[in-house]
Amino acid sequence: MPYLYRIAYDGTLFYGFTGHPNSLEPKLRAALGEILGRGSRTDPGVSAVANVVMTSQRLHLGYVNSKLPRGVWAWGVAEVPEGFNPRRAKARRYLYVAPHWGEDVEAMREAAAVLVGTHDYSSFIKRRGDKATPTVTTVYKIEVEQRGGLIYMMFVGRGFRNKMIRKMAWAILATGRGVLKASDLRELVERPRPGAVPSAPAEGLVLLDIDYGIEFEVYHTALREAYTYFLRKYRAVEAHAAALKAAGEALARLDVV
């Protein structure tokens, strides 16, 4: 029987999920054996809380984690039926975080609403060379929220194609800055123009969940280790950001800027 494994990882440590010597999949293969399928092929720099891979082996998660490199954790496992396809999820949930530089949040919400629904998203997809890749998919929800100096965008959909969320995030932010209007996004949806939209930086994106309606057996030790890792890394980045802010404020006091 095939088995699904829940995987969390720091995407900044790897060159994407697959297709490169330093991608994540070879590391997973060394610990789990042959990979029969995956939930999402995340880009270089994109982290995940709950991606999945499928194998034919049921291994103890303590053993699996002992074989994984720093920044990767297998924290759940579930048996699935023969013929199960991990690409066919009920929903995928991603979070994109960007600095707030005064963007109009209401304009961003209006832009996000345009992108919700079942559409041909060719304007927001980078093809991987396979021109047969479907470009029609369903986005269930996009939420935009400002919290202090940051913009949080939550994307929920059946499936997202290559670079799709990062391109939608760029377009929503551009609308908040007045570079685009919601009507421009509507035009891109109704009359697709492949290559028309750039991608927002990968480091702002995290895969939060892939919903299969399946209950996973959870290995809590790995969850706690992953939580501690991300919290410590956040604190280190927060300290670095505070130092940069202090440097900028010192320059301002010197009337350099």
From Swiss-Prot:
Q: Which Pfam families match?
A: PseudoU_synth_1
Check the UniProt entry and state the signal peptide residues, or none.
Answer: none
The Swiss-Prot or TrEMBL record annotates one GO molecular function as: tRNA pseudouridine(38-40) synthase activity
Q: List the catalysed reactions.
A: uridine(38/39/40) in tRNA = pseudouridine(38/39/40) in tRNA
Active-site residues?
D43
UniProt EC number: 5.4.99.12
- Chain residues that bind substrate: Y94
Q: Which UniProt keywords apply?
A: Isomerase, tRNA processing
Extract one GO BP annotation from the record: tRNA pseudouridine synthesis
Task: Say what the protein does.
Answer: Formation of pseudouridine at positions 38, 39 and 40 in the anticodon stem and loop of transfer RNAs.
Would you identify the family this protein belongs to, as annotated? Belongs to the tRNA pseudouridine synthase TruA family.
Identification of the protein by name: tRNA pseudouridine synthase A
Q: What is the lineage of its organism?
A: Archaea, Thermoproteota, Thermoprotei, Thermoproteales, Thermoproteaceae
